Amino acid sequence: MAVMNDNKIVVYQVLTRLFGNTNTTNKPWGTIEENGVGKFADFTTKALEELKALGVTHIWFTGVLHHALTTDYTAYGISNDFPAVVKGRAGSPYAIKDYYTVNPDLADDPTQRLEEWEALIARTHQCGLKVIMDIVPNHVARRYESIAKPEGTRGFGEDDDTTVQYAVNNNFYYNPNEAFQLPEGIYGEYHEFPAKWTGNGARASKPDRNDWYETVKLNYGVRPDGTKDFVELPASFENEDTEAHYHFWADKTVPDTWRKFKDIALYWLGKGVDGFRYDMAEMVPVEFWSYLNSAIKHQNPKAFLLAEVYNPNEYRPYLHLGKMDYLYDKVQLYDTLRNIVTHGHSTDAIAPIQHNLADIAHRMLHFLENHDEQRIASPEFAGYAEKAKPAMTVSTFISESPVMLYFGQEVGEKAAEVAGFGSPSRTSIFDYIGVPAHQRWVNNKRFDGGQLSETERSLRNFYQRLLNLKVNGAYIDLHQYNRQHTEYYNDRVYSFARGNEDEQWVIVSNFSEHDHFGFDLQLPDYLLGSWFLNDGTYTLTDALYNEKHTTLQIANGKGRLRVDIAPLESLIFKISKLVDS
């Protein structure tokens, strides 16, 4: 298992093409000329320094790879894509067309697009930040065409036997003698023969419009009947390190797709990328991840590897056998916190999640927003950004795990625009569009928040304070104990402790929009014993704003902490000194 850092990892996901776009036209289905686009160059040293000051340690630059799009770059030797199999005008960042170069939209000079990306990598490193980019292993654009691949490299599908449905070294699955047909309701011109299976696994030559019809499924040596055409890992290898995994695969024959992706990952590591976010990782066999990740760690032991995995039953296999560093904590913590914020569900649901994940909690990435999820401030989620402050506090501090925010989240972006293919409530990843609240922070590329409202400025200040606060030590639930033993403590509040012998923290969040609460929070004797706290009175100060103070009374091994908490407030108390004993 990798130990990634000494401090909290804070990932900032940014849709690269939207970050520096200052155009406010926001015409539905607008072209790049009408609605504008951001560039690599927009990530200036000033912008990067501001992100670092926010508390960010890693930037996930989303949409860097050259994906299918509708803008014409034939003057630069790039073939046009067929609009019928491109979602939106700007295209999906997850329909990769060429893994060895980057999106020409993002370059001031498309002929220098790779060099401009390399310059941004260097600039990011100079500001003390790490660079993460996507790898999308499950599928590629319907018309994959790598014009930038290194000499001697073969592109996906170039050597496939298209007369058979499956062959172990084919990169795609085929329906021989059948032509691809566009889904019902999707119009335009596109020819593909024979038809390939669609990215989400749909096998029909005419997929449904809700299928991932703009992509094709990659073949990892899994036969159509689900059996595997490769060596499986011994179960004991969940306890082996990445070097043991690397040596395991050294003399094994693996499917061609595996080798191609290893070459791709090592290519980008060689360009200075610090790690990868793997799209839909659980749709690819865990053995492949052992093969790929052990090769990556062999080249760069500190590489950051984050996987989008949604099935809790797959968490441990993908961590221990697949050698991921971190996984999304979406269907448990995110979904639970969202239900508390949106629907007023009980906070009693939080503690069991941490209990069930106790052995891997530090490897579950927490977030409240990303490109797939609705914006907090949208009516579909919270309606206004401040309502999720307690959830963000819990998400950030409940464990040592990394936390992620999505650009614009820190200023309350609502994503209310009708962009085109994308719908309001999510910032569109498919369209040329502006991000209004974020643009007010960008302030004509001054990156100083000069156009933010006072409310937006205050929210960003909250995030900056939160993300720069270093809370260490083991997690101990206080909620269940106080639900049983503390008068006036209730399920609109959540409390927990973090700490060790050297530093101790008590964190309380109030999820109620309207109600103040007051109670004497009880700290159980086993907690006080583990912290070696003697009887007496201790002072506590809220470390978030340094304005609220309280005392912890310990007598006969039992502790009581007075808490008076306002609606949507979080108190992060650090136990500092013994007043008397």
Residue ranges and their predicted role:
Residues V216-Y315:
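Active-site neighborhood of glycoside hydrolase catalytic domains
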Residues N21-A41, A95-L114, L218, A235-T257, ...:
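The substrate-binding groove and active-site-proximal loops of carbohydrate-active enzymes
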Residues A141-E151, V286-H298, V309-V341, K414-F421:
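Substrate-binding cleft/loops of secretory-pathway carbohydrate-active enzymes
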Residues M1-K130, N138-K149, T153-N170, P176-G188, ...:
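N-terminal structural segment of carbohydrate-active enzymes
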Residues V10-Y12, I59-F61, V131-M133, F276, ...:
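Hydrophobic faces of well-ordered beta-strands that scaffold small-molecule active sites
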Residues T22, L69, A84, N311, ...:
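Loop/helix patches that line or flank the sugar-binding groove of alpha-linked glycan CAZymes
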Residues S512-S581:
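C-terminal beta-sandwich/jelly-roll accessory domains of carbohydrate-active enzymes
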Residues V37-L51, T253-L269, A388-M392:
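Short, acidic/polar
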